[in-house]
């Protein structure tokens, strides 16, 4: 089992816009919503390679619930620490002549919540 840690998971909203013009209304040609975050991305690749994996990380708010749902739909094992405030981030990926990314900040994580993750990791090292 390979464990990955994602402290700041995201919903990545990718849109394709032909001839994007700053300061004007632009219409999308395609839209796509995916889960993201470095640990999540690694676990997705491991799953596709047939390697058992489990995600450990933090989620918050409605976006966090959507991240959890989408990971479950991909049949990837995960253990989330739900943060009481804020929302997991949304990243906007604008594809046009040039690619532009706008990454959300994500929720604040308290020392108590970091300790909770450290305890989970401590249990793993004893196994």
Please provide the spans of the model-predicted regions:
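Conserved N-terminal subdomain of the carbohydrate kinase-like
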Residues: 49-127
């Amino acid at each position: 089992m390979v464990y990955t840690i994602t402290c700041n998971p995201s919903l990545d909203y990718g849109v394709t816009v032909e001839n994007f013009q700053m300061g004007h209304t632009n219409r999308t040609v395609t839209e796509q919503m995916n889960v993201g975050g470095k640990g999540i991305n690694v676990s997705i690749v491991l799953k596709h390679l047939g390697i058992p994996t489990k995600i450990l990380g933090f989620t918050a708010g409605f976006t966090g619930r959507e991240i959890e749902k989408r990971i479950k739909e991909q049949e990837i094992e995960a253990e989330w620490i739900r943060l009481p405030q804020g929302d997991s981030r949304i990243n906007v990926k604008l594809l046009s002549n040039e690619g532009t990314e706008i990454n959300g900040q994500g929720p604040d994580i308290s020392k108590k919540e970091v300790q909770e993750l450290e305890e989970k990791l401590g249990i793993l090292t004893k196994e």
